[in-house]
Amino acid sequence: MVLDDLGSSLRGTLDTLRGKSRISEEDVDKVVKEIQRSLLQADVDVDLVMDLSESITERSLEEEPPGGTSARDHVLRIVYEELVGLVGDSTPIPLEEQTIMLAGLQGSGKTTTAAKMAWWFSKKGLRPAIVQTDTFRPGAYEQAAEMADRAEVDFYGEPDSDDPVQIARDGLAATADADVHIVDTAGRHALEDDLIAEIEEIEGVVEPDRSLLVLDAAIGQGAKQQARQFDASIGIDGVAITKLDGTAKGGGSLTAVNETDSTIAFLGSGETVQDIERFEPDSFISRLLGMGDLKQLTERVERAMEETQDDDEDWDPEDLMKGEFTLHDMRKQMQAMDNMGPLDQVMDMIPGMGGGLMDELPDDAMDVTQERMRGFEVIMDSMTEAEMADPRSVGASQIRRIARGSGQPEDRVRELLDQHKMMAQTMQQFQGMGDGDMQRMMSKMQQQGGGGGGGFGGMF
């Protein structure tokens, strides 16, 4: 993920300040050098890095920490505020009628981003439509149509036309009933004059309310020139950063934001249309520093529960807080967890669970955990209705039968039963809580954000 190395290395450096009530110049120098190293390796512009370093050094040594604040927390707060300032505000995207035009080089992820954004708007109660104007790239129409179908949104394109400007004009007319028009434009392998001329013509027809530059997180220092030319041509209002699930460094996209004096609008990761989120600087840096993001976590949980309930109208997640917790319920929770997205992203949103704890886990921990969950589902397929309803009734002979039927080891069947028992006990604790108790618990988790945690319901 973008700047992930910075988060990992900085957390380790800040941990060396634990137990100190005062901070020395040597301590600050060590933290600042770690920030410089990580940002420069992430392709952030050197001038930005130097400005940030100077500000952190000055504030850390001159500002008096509030009473009772440790040296680590004092520096952490300053680093947090300065990094939030570095990434900038979020691009305003009002939930109202509007036209958005996407620009960028070929391969930056514009077509996928158009579908993801359309899906996002649809979940906010608006009716979006994608207008595909790319007549340059082979297969562009087919890809866009397929992605729009996955997002379940309106789509317009003309596969036999070679006039992108006319397609844009016709597309807006054909989808006039839509609240939000997302116009996907053609890219090239480089910034060519014909690309700039074409996108300027489309802009004249579309008259977008905002133009977003789509950037691959791996763009590197080339982002500066690209951003400058697109901004001079059509004016860039915001940036959508894509492919954050890869090993990309991501700093070049921050450079582009600074170069165009714009902001970040969306972050994209993964191949599905749901793999998108609005950029929230506070939440982004909070996750980066291992402090969690309860707001984003809550939104993902609510969305995942809704999607899981849509798949099975007889299942109501509120029933979990009332009666017995069965294996059916556990399975639905696992499906909801899967709907939340990659586990490592979810973990980063839990205060005390991301950050330092994630650094300590093996690189394949998330893959192993998801594989175990898939194994659990296979085991449940081999269980009877009575066993699913009352797992406590499952004895040794039944474990042997279930293992044979599922092709899973007997130990894995026992592991599932133990996992269910642990989750059932957790649900009982929640059942006894009032709203005030829940809020106090979540507040405590937020306060403990940087301090590490343990386990994830026994899954690790």
UniProtKB/Swiss-Prot annotation:
Name of the protein this chain belongs to: Signal recognition particle 54 kDa protein
A Gene Ontology term for the protein's cellular component: signal recognition particle
UniProt family annotation: Belongs to the GTP-binding SRP family. SRP54 subfamily.
Assembly and binders: Part of the signal recognition particle protein translocation system, which is composed of SRP and FtsY. Archaeal SRP consists of a 7S RNA molecule of 300 nucleotides and two protein subunits: SRP54 and SRP19.
Keyword Transcription regulation listed: no
Binding locations of GTP: 104-111, 184-188, 242-245
Known function: Involved in targeting and insertion of nascent membrane proteins into the cytoplasmic membrane. Binds to the hydrophobic signal sequence of the ribosome-nascent chain (RNC) as it emerges from the ribosomes. The SRP-RNC complex is then targeted to the cytoplasmic membrane where it interacts with the SRP receptor FtsY.
